[in-house]
């Protein structure tokens, strides 16, 4: 079967230098981009049901900019003032610098690794007495909690945002696409949530195979 039209279940790249467009030109493909999932913040009511007191904690571990955004969002909605004594531990330098959007950047209270969870070990061990808060999505890896357990550190997980299906009702006919490229199980779940009764044959492409 000759592949002509591909639906990519992600947002359109911001730059024309993306490999997607190189592939499209090389193989004469028509690419359409449509995010199948989106991130929504939990409501104040949902957060309160978790029974997490932000101010009980002396340090926060951030794994992404999204986690930072939703932490300060929920603090604003709860009218919680984060004390200047709060310490921040970030997965990477880029994530740490993003904190400047919300706080004054002070090196003595902001720490970061080199994009890998294991890089955080030495840093965290220097702060054994802290009570850590870990903002997460409803769908998350357990690598950070597992590391904290391994190091016998005190922490609390807080679900501050969630991955939900996008509304795809404007897509009239999935059969017009020769391939639909997925990158997460959530994207596939969104497909069947939007088209529960749609009988068709599709090809799943993993990121390490194509696109």
Regions found by a protein language model. Give the residues of each.
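Conserved beta-alpha
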Residues: 1-211
């Amino acid at each position: 079967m000759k592949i002509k039209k591909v639906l990519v279940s992600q947002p359109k790249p911001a730059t024309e230098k993306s490999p997607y467009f190189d592939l499209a030109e090389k193989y004469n493909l028509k690419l359409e981009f449509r995010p199948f999932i989106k991130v929504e913040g939990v409501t104040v009511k949902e957060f309160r049901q978790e029974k997490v007191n932000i101010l009980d904690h002396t340090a926060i571990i951030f794994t992404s900019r999204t986690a930072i955004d939703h932490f300060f969002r929920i603090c604003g909605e709860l009218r919680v003032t984060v004390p200047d004594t709060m310490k921040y531990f970030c997965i990477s330098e880029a994530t740490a610098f993003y904190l400047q959007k919300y706080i004054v950047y002070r090196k003595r209270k902001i720490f970061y690794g080199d994009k890998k969870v294991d890089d955080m070990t030495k840093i965290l061990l220097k702060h054994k007495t802290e009570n850590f808060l870990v903002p997460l999505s409803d769908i998350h890896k357990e690598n950070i909690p597992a590391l904290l357990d391994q190091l016998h550190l005190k922490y609390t997980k807080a679900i501050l945002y969630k991955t939900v299906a996008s509304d795809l009702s404007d897509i009239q006919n999935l059969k017009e696409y020769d391939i639909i490229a997925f990158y997460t199980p959530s994207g596939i779940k969104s497909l069947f949530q939007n088209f529960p009764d749609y009988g068709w044959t599709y090809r799943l492409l993993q990121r390490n195979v194509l696109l």
